[in-house]
């Protein structure tokens, strides 16, 4: 797709997909942009603008066919493809990710987990998933065609791991380390502490 899609649009696209999934479960066949906006606390014009990046989906005065739009957005998001992942870092976060079974149900299959700690190497991190030495990371990624790397290492090691993953052919990175990493592949940063700070700010502001 030639046109560059703003990152906020991609995030909202995921919300649209999940909302449409719920609508299908409810047996809804047609939905308007106004109803989607109400459910997602957005403006209908924003939804229409976001969807226009990818083509024409609805009819003015009629709305969107829920199943058709759900399938179309799913295709855009790559949900029908099974994605291979590796986790680097077998600490609490890394093991939690490896044991999150919902990921496999949604098409994300973790096929390897790596660490540099000798006390963790060779131990089971999740059912059927044994911790490997991080020195084997590049070879594993290349041999298995891994597409997504999950970084769950201390901040001081995150950039190095990201660069190694990129050189090995990783297509995207999910970063749990509390530091921004710089690589040419797409990166999604998950900073739990930062999110909690935003939450506490809202709590304090609401109760002041």
From Swiss-Prot:
Protein's cellular compartments: Cytoplasm
UniProt keyword terms in alphabetical order: Cytoplasm, DNA-binding, NAD, Repressor, Transcription, Transcription regulation
InterPro entries given in the database record: CoA-bd, NAD(P)-bd_dom_sf, Rex_DNA-bd_C_dom, Tscrpt_rep_Rex, WH-like_DNA-bd_sf, WH_DNA-bd_sf
DNA-binding region: 15-54
Residues given in the record as NAD(+) binding sites: 89-94
Keyword Cytoplasm among record annotations: yes
The UniProt record lists the keyword Iron-sulfur: no
Pfam families reported in the protein's UniProt record: CoA_binding, Put_DNA-bind_N
Example of a GO MF term: DNA binding
Cystine connections: none
GO BP annotation list: negative regulation of DNA-templated transcription; response to redox state
Any one of the GO CC terms: cytoplasm
Subunit and interaction comment: Homodimer.
Primary role: Modulates transcription in response to changes in cellular NADH/NAD(+) redox state.
Family: Belongs to the transcriptional regulatory Rex family.
Descriptive protein name: Redox-sensing transcriptional repressor Rex 1
Protein's organism: Thermotoga maritima (strain ATCC 43589 / DSM 3109 / JCM 10099 / NBRC 100826 / MSB8)
Name of the encoding gene: rex1
